[in-house]
Amino acid sequence: MNTLEDRLRAVEDKLAIFHLIASHPPAADSGNGGYYRDAFMPDAVIDLGTKTAQGNEAIAAVLKTPEHQAVIAGGLCHFAGLPRVELHGDTAVAISYLQVIAPNREAEPVELSGHGLSSGYRIHRLGVNRWDLKRTGDGWKVTRRAYRMLDGTEGARELLQEAAAK
C-alpha cells in the first residue's frame, strides 16, 4: 500500500465497512430487515453460537419473529464498539464488541438534572462479533457474522485473539 490511491482506497473501504457495521444496531433495534437484505450476501451465514441462519432473507426474517418484536418493544438495544478492520484486497475481517442493553425494571428510579427520571439500564450481555466481508459491485457485503458471548468460554477469546495478533 504505497501509492496515495492505494491509501485512499483503504480509507474509503474502512469507512464503508464502519458504516455497514454501525448500521447493524439501529436495524436490529427497529426491526429493519431491509438492512440484512442489503448488507448481507444472499448466501451469508449468521452464527450466534447457539443458533445459525443462512441467507440474507432468513437472517432478515429473524427480526419479524414474535420473540424479537417483544424484546425491542420492551426497550432492548444493541450498542456496538468501533470495529478493528483488516483489509485483504477484496475481502475483509472486522472484529467488534457488541453490548445488548435492557431497561432495568427492578431498579429504583433516579432523577438526573436535565435528563429526567429513569430506572436505568443494565448490560444484558457483552459479546464479540467477527464480520467476514466481501467487496461486490454494490459495495461491501457480509458473507459471515459470528457472535460469541464474553462469558469466560473460549469462543469469544478466540475471536479477540485474532484481532490482537495483527
Predicted regions and their residues:
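A solvent-exposed, acidic/Ser-Thr-rich amphipathic alpha-helical stretch
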Residues: 33-104
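Short beta-strand edge/turn micro-motifs at domain boundaries
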Residues: 91-95, 116-158
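Short, low-complexity N-terminal intrinsically disordered segments enriched in polar/charged residues
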Residues: 1-26, 30, 38
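Short helix-capping and inter-helix turn/linker motifs at the boundaries of alpha-helical repeat units
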Residues: 11-15, 73, 120
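Short, glycine/acidic-rich beta->alpha junctions
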Residues: 16, 75-77, 124-125
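Short, surface-exposed loop/helix-turn segments at secondary-structure junctions
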Residues: 106-118
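Flexible, surface-exposed loop regions and adjacent strand-edge segments
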Residues: 111-113, 160-163
